Amino acid sequence: VAPAQLDEILHPILDPASEKKASVIANGLPASPGGAVGVIAFTSEAAMEAAEKGIATILVREETSPEDVEGMRACAGILTQRGGMTSHAALVARGWGKCCIVGCEAMHIDLENKVIKFKGSDKEYHEGDVLSLNGAKGYVYDVAIDTMDASDNPRFVQFMEIVDKFRTMGVRTNADTPEDAARAISFGAEGIGLFRIEHMFYGQNAETPLSKLRKMI
């Protein structure tokens, strides 16, 4: 059993029957599995404002940085023009279990006018237009596709109980918030292995300026 197979069943996915009816408009690297549907948000602030209203978003960026973490947390999925499987967006999204596609080179983003175009098409996509992402395959769609929520899978629990009898090492998690830690513990992690301190200096809960971080380093 490949680890990726276990990972995929723990995420919401696009409904296979609905996805078959849609056409792929672009593809990128499948950085983090799962499915996501939402309206385009070009900034973290826009994603956060939409989340407060109960609106799901796809955060569209050329690439992400630590300053985007609050918007990344608020959105349903992440789509970047640049980046690889070890880019900031990919690493953070996988750590959170959030759908993410990176390196979508066919996408051109005009941030000034808040417009997206995809290679081979003159169609423009604006903030508020719908996108659907298949993070397991790296597919991008311009229609709202039905999703299937992930639920507790008794076979997954049974499998983990079996392999737990034979493992020879402990597993700790990367976590930046109490919510991250609680989620990891629920999946069997035994503690915290890495805490990225730079995330304390960004986002809505950050009270210490970046200069303090630089001084500390």
Region roles according to the model:
Residues 1-217:
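Non-catalytic helical/linker scaffolds that mediate oligomerization, partner binding
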